[in-house]
């Protein structure tokens, strides 16, 4: 479908030779009020928060002290590259940001200087173990400068190759791609649309930082003339403990909903996010292919989605028809 409409597919799930997104590259996400508090501070602080969310996807069991030290080590690494809370990030290019190799050097250098067996050294050793795969077996996914051509008006980031692989790696890669894609939508003078398929994957990891990031994207999109399309088959992941507040924010900041057929429990979960009466709940459980509940403001109607021959052709063999 992408190529039929003149777009580009980027197979990030296949590794660096197909395109790399550097998790340490900083995106310029700040509005006018935030700029008043100091652009560098706002942008770098958000970057550090998103990097901690990234690490939580990659290593859900990471201890709080290790995560805190990771943030400090990243700040030290940024400082070596002239990146501080007072930097003008509009002047940086992709090749000027550090990579995980540079973060790993910071960690190993600090370990070398720690001759005593202390708690700080223990935490640093645990951090080194978490980071080591980034410069070894996972380097083709996460270690390198961003190398993606973003000139196309229609970009699809494909991670299909990883959907059946280790869940933590997949989730970290998906979050990294989402953060990068959001960075492409931050020019208020250009209309853009950010579509996130399989959004439940991000929330299914019960990563509150990641859920908060997606909720912030949904809230802030209109400031940048960006439309968002959030697609999920599992509303249950939006109502999990610790996630519900962000799940509701994602739905509350939507202009309309298109609800297709769902099973009983999924309908009950969805009703925690949007108002559904009993008739609508029963209808959703019985919907067949193409039937949907369309909600736009106060208007609610059952519709039938009729696909055209051109649309069928664009789906290829992956349309499920």
Mark where each language-model region is:
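P-loop NTPase motor domains
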Residues: 1-8, 12-15, 22-226, 230, ...
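Feature targets compositionally biased, intrinsically disordered low-complexity regions
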Residues: 18, 37, 315-319
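Short, acidic/turn-prone active-site loops that include or flank metal/cofactor-
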Residues: 14-17, 262-264
